[in-house]
C-alpha cells in the first residue's frame, strides 16, 4: 500500500479535507499527487539519483563526453603553441645580443692586433677594415643625431597642429567655414607626419641592410686572412724541413771533404733568420685565437690546469723518498704518505716494490690515498719477502675483501708484522671475508694489533682470543729471553771471579819475586803441607710454606671454608667424648644393654 492511498483514507475520514479536495481542479490534483509521490528506495540506485528532478528548465542539449575532451585538447594545444612562440622569441633575442657582443669583441681584437700582424710579417698594414669601422661608427653617430632632430620636428609639428585646431574650434562658433579649414589642416598635418614616419623607418631599414653587408664583408676578409696564415705556416714548416735536410747533407759532405766551416756558419745564420719569422707568426696566431676562445667554454680550462699540474708534480715529489727506500737509507725508518692528494696507485705500487728488499723501514702508512686492490696485491707480495716492517696502515681506502684476504694470506709467511689497520674502507668486507680472516689468523702467532671493527660477533670473539693468545706467547718469549740473559751474565761472572789465596799457594809453590813487607800469619802455609780448612756449612733452608694457608690467602673471603679457619682448642664434653667413642668403635666391641623401663 502506497502512502497516497493512506493519505486518501485519512482524507476520506476527515470531512473538511474531503470538501477541500472536491473544490480542487484536476491540474491542482496532479500537482498535489506529484508532491506526495515518493519513490520507494532502491539499494542498487545511488542516493543522489533516488530523488526526482525538480528543475523546471529544459536541457539545452545532450552531454557528449568525446566532444568535451576534443575541445579541451584543442585549447591545451593552443596554449602550448603560444608558450613555445614566446620562448622562441626570447631565444632569438638572446642570440642576437650574443652575436652583437661577439662582433664587438672581434672588432676590438682586430683593432688591437691588426698593426702588430702587419709589422711582424713585413707586409703593408691593411687600413681598409679600420676605415670601414670608423666610417660605420660615424654613420651610426650621424644617424642617431639625424634621427633626434627629425623626431623633435615631428613632435613640434604635432603640437602646432593641436594649437591650430584649438583656435579653429573657438572660431567655429562664429563661422562654419573655420571648421572646414581646421579639418583640412588636420588632415594635411597627419599626412605630413605619416610621410615623415615612413621615411624614418625606410632610413632605418637601409642602415640595417648596410650593416649586414659590412658584417658579411668582414667575415669574408677574416676567412681569407686565416687561409693566408695557414698557407704561411705550411710554407714555413716546409722550409724548415727542407732546410734541415739540406743542412744535414751539406754538413756530411763537408765533413767528408774536410772543408766547410764557413758554409756551416752561413747555413746556421739562414736557419736562425727563418726561425724568428715562424715564431712570430705562431705568436700572432695564438694571440688572434685567444680572444675568440673567451667564450662560455673558457672557465672550464683553468680547472683542468691545476689537476694536470698536480699529476705532473706528483712524481717529482715522491722521487727522492723512492730512491732513499731503494738505496736502503738507514735514516729512513718510516714511509708515511697519509692524506696525500697528488699520489697515484702507480706510485704506491712503486713504493711497495721498493720495500720488498728493504731492511730498514719499519712503518708503512698509506691512509686516505685512494689505494685499491692492485696496491693491496702488491703489498701482499711485499710482505712475503720483507722481514722488517712491523706496522702497516691502510685506513680509509678503496680496498675490497679480495685485497684484504690476499694480505692476510701473505701473513702466513710473515713473522714480523705486529700491527695491521684497514678500517673505514669504501667497500664493506662482509661476513664471509670476516670468517676467512678469523681462519687465517689462527695460523699466525705474531700479529698483536688489528685495526678493524668486525660486524659479526663470532669472528670478533675469535680474533680477540687469537690476539690475546699471541700477546701471551710474546710475553713468554720475553721472559725466556730475560732468563737466558741473566744466566749468561751469571756464567760470565763465575768466569771472571779471582781465585782464593790458598788455591794460588797450592798451584804455585815458587815464591813471588815481590815479597810483601808485612807477611800475614794466616796466609803462610805450615810446614809439612797441612790440609786447608773446610768451607763453612751452608745456611739452613727456609721452612716449607703451608699450602692451605697460601690457598686461603689467594682465594676470596667468600669462597673460604669455615672448617679451614684455625680455631682455638676447647675442652670436650662427656657427650662429645661418647660420640667420638661410638664413631671409633665397631659392632663387635659394642655390648647389648637392656632398654630402661622409662623408654619401654
Curated annotation (Swiss-Prot):
GO molecular function: actin binding; tropomyosin binding
Top-rank taxon: Eukaryota
Source organism of this protein record: Homo sapiens
Subcellular location: Cytoplasm, Myofibril, Sarcomere; Cytoplasm, Cytoskeleton
Keyword Metal-binding belongs to the record: no
GO biological process: actin filament organization; actin nucleation; muscle contraction; myofibril assembly; pointed-end actin filament capping; positive regulation of actin filament polymerization
Protein name in UniProt: Leiomodin-1
Entry similarity comment: Belongs to the tropomodulin family.
Gene designation per UniProt: LMOD1
Annotated spans, 8 X approximate tandem repeats: 165-293
